[in-house]
Amino acid sequence: MEQSKKTSFDFYMLPLVLAVAVVPLLTMMTSYSSGIGKYTWASGGSFVDFFLGFKRGALILLGAVIIILFCAAQWMRVQAKAVWTTKNQKIVLILLAVFGGVTAISALLADEKIDALFGGFEQMEGLLVVTAYVALFCLAYFLLSSENKIQVIVHALLIGSLILSVLGALQAFGVDYLANDVTTPFFTMFMHALPKKFNGITASFGKGVSYATLYNPNYVGSYVALVLPLTIYEAVQDEKNRYKIVAAASAVCQLIMLKGSGSLAGMVGVGAAVCVAVLFLFSDIYKNRKILCGVFVVAVGLVALFLWKNPTFFRSVIKGNGEPCSSHISSMISDGTSVKITLHSGKMITLRWDADATVYEFEALNENGKKIEMTGDSFSGVKLKGDAYQGLLFEATKRQITYQEQKTYFDVLRLTVDDKYSWDFAMLGVGLRYINGVGKPDMLHYVESFGMEGRYDFASNRGYIWSRTFPLLKRALLLGVGQDNFAYAFPNDDYVGKVNCGFNEQIVTKPHNMYLQIWVQDGLPALLAFLALYLLLFGRTIRKCFKKGKWNHSQKISLAFLCGVSGYFVAGLANDSSICVAPVFWILFGVAFAVLRSE
């Protein structure tokens, strides 16, 4: 890596500086529309956003600027060509092209192309944003040819991370400058009309929970796992004292923010970064013995503290709660004239209606086809005789239903389970229908699942989401369903499964696993190319850092970048790619390869 003494700021670096330091901080309340409202499991198509919209707009703009720069500036094209014609560097661009190309084709062939291109509900990470990620990676990889230029990006990251982590640390102490009466007028300035019953901006996570400007506490974990290793390195190694102070303050606030977020994925990601650092420090174990001992003591202390605070952690990871569902009902399937119900005990009930019957006129059959005796009536409550059917109550009521694009009141038979869960059925012109939580009629059908049985509660109910995601993988062996189309591929009409695992009317928009997300949305080749890029970075960093002789700055900062990237990859086992953190990742990913280009 060139040891240039020039410290001037070049214009082409501005997109990198803005993306790494400013974009994660952008928040503003805006309204938007989504085509998701046409689906029976979604309430409507109009939503309010606070964290994602401005980030998306900024990234699309930066991506366009970078592409224009590459097309207009000859010297940039020459630099890119020089990288392409270098044998050891060409493989990076080939892998990146596979990732970007397969992602683009998947998006262009997606069922919901608008979402795939521009971003969808609660994600806003469409193809245009992914194109910006790739452009940022290329800009960093092609053009950061000197140590000082790389330091400009690192220093921008330090300043941005300090601002963000101070906000997060204050939230951990119950002080939230994003959700209070003073800042609300600023954050709502672009709203033409505020939602009804608007009482100011409030955090849905509760007081004392850190989310900073990253939309969700989980993404705080991904951010800290990515940025903390480089921040700590700069706090120790930066040549300028003012940046050492900024880095040290940022590192402390990041740790407080991580604790406030409660993100286990982030904690594990930080632990993985520490492990990678230890692995490389073993290249000179005698010289680094004091550091290794210190890291070991701190690591043991952190693990001991975590286990003391979470004594049932390993039991819950290995066994879950041992309950595949929390409801009396395991599944329901309807066909227009009947509903087949499977109870948690294994018993089966079939509710059957005649073609011309009202919704209140039904009979119940057991698994052998014999009628089950009933007591009471529909208006006072019907119960089935037998201990196996305890906790089930059928009642007559009326409910407003969205049917044929109009809201109308219909007679409804309500099945209440254990005085907690209710399931409404109505007889419409098309036959018997289940009325879901958003007041729309739908059918109940078999939902394919794989694995995690008895562990649906694993990792905050990720076990359930993964069990419904695994069957989707086989349809994405070549191409995926398209960026931000996961919500449409996932069985969001798995009403029983979602209620049993506490999701109720929530729309599952992501698999809570970055690798499953890429596979399903972009296709298996895109995932393999993405993983190959990391393995290439890991291998080249090993070759660089395990050379004999005194460690130089290039080797040390290569290790810092690798630790951060590794932490992000590990956190991705339980977190998704998010527009709040991914721009920082792709830039640091590109910078990490740029540092290695001299090899």
Language-model features and meaning:
Residues 34-53, 113-116, 196-213, 464, ...:
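Juxtamembrane membrane-water interface segments that cap and precede transmembrane helices
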Residues 117-127:
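Non-cytosolic membrane-interface motifs at loop->transmembrane helix junctions
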Residues 121, 255-258, 449-455, 551-552:
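Glycine- and acidic
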Residues 140, 216, 354, 359-363, ...:
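TM-adjacent membrane-interface loops and short helices in multi-pass inner/ER membrane proteins
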Residues 2-29, 57-74, 90-113, 126-404, ...:
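Alpha-helical transmembrane segments of multi-pass inner-membrane proteins
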Residues 1-3, 598-599:
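Short, charged juxtamembrane terminal tails flanking transmembrane helices
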Residues 76-79, 596-599:
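Membrane-interface capping segments at transmembrane-helix boundaries
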Residues 31-43, 177-190, 480, 490:
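Interfacial/capping segments of alpha-helical transmembrane domains
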